[in-house]
């Protein structure tokens, strides 16, 4: 029987070592795209071939190709001078991203509520408790990682619905770079952990309507945090 337990410096998580089986140009592209989407590079941050090639330990050619491909996807923008910068989305575009995420995950959690196992519930609770312990120690990097793992584990429940699962994963990647800032201060991290507790409780009660309301509220709060941060950045620039 599942028991809901009582409430109790930025880094990248991927390796900079290229597996031999992956072409260099593909590896460089995937690595840089991950860094942009994870928020390792901030919107507006300048990116140069020379610096990135040195950091990745590759020649400038695959980096140049990766940057042009990212530019075609709207993730970076070429500068009038040399180099590129990480693209800045408008407030409307960011709001749309969060609204899309809310619609997808609102439906997904209804499916999850019907089929989740006791083992998965325990796993989700474990990530919450680890995040809470990290919050008590003010280990913000760990909180970010455990909260990401919470959502990864939640969506694995419906991984059999391949296309739907892929849509959710892609949307989360684009949202993540605007989400990280609220998790790197204590109040935002605490609010996120509390939101995950509410999600877990709703799922454990097997109430799909409650589940959808709770996760939509969780995403709405995240959207407000992101829009507030972007607005403050615009004022400061």
Regions found by a protein language model. Give the residues of each.
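Short linear motifs at protein or domain termini
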Residues: 1-114, 119, 163, 212, ...
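C-terminal regulatory/effector modules of DNA-binding transcriptional regulators
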Residues: 1-3, 188-237
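Short helix-capping and inter-helix turn/linker motifs at the boundaries of alpha-helical repeat units
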Residues: 23, 121-122, 187-190
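Residues within well-formed alpha-helices
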Residues: 27, 65, 107, 111, ...
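Mobile beta-alpha loop/short-helix "lid" or hinge segments that flank ligand
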Residues: 72-77, 171-173, 187-190
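Alpha-helix N-cap/N′ positions at the starts of helices
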Residues: 81, 104, 126, 191-194
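Conserved amphipathic alpha-helical segments that form helical-bundle/coiled-coil interaction surfaces
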Residues: 93, 97, 118-181, 194-202, ...
């Amino acid at each position: 029987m599942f028991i809901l337990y009582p409430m109790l410096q930025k880094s990248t998580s991927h390796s900079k070592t290229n597996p031999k089986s992956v072409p260099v140009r593909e590896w460089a592209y995937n690595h840089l795209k991950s860094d942009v989407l994870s928020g390792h590079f901030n919107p507006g941050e300048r990116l140069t071939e020379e610096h990135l090639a040195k950091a990745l330990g590759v020649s400038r050619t695959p980096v140049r190709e990766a940057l042009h491909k990212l530019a075609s996807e709207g993730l970076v923008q070429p500068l009038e001078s040399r180099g590129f910068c990480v693209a800045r989305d408008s407030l409307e575009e960011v709001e749309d991203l969060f609204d899309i995420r809310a619609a997808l995950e609102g439906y997904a959690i209804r499916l999850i509520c019907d089929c989740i196992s006791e083992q998965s519930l325990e796993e989700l609770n474990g990530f919450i408790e680890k995040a809470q312990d990290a919050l008590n120690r003010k280990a913000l990097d760990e909180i970010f990682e455990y909260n990401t793992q919470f959502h990864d584990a939640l969506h694995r429940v419906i991984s059999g619905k391949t296309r739907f699962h892929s849509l959710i994963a892609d949307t989360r990647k684009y949202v993540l770079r605007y989400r990280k800032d609220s998790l790197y201060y204590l109040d935002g991290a605490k609010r996120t952990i509390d939101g995950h507790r509410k999600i877990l409780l709703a799922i454990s009660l097997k109430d799909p309507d409650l589940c959808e309301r709770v996760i939509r509220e969780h995403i709405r709060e995240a959207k407000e945090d992101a829009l507030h941060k972007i607005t403050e950045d615009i004022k400061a620039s």
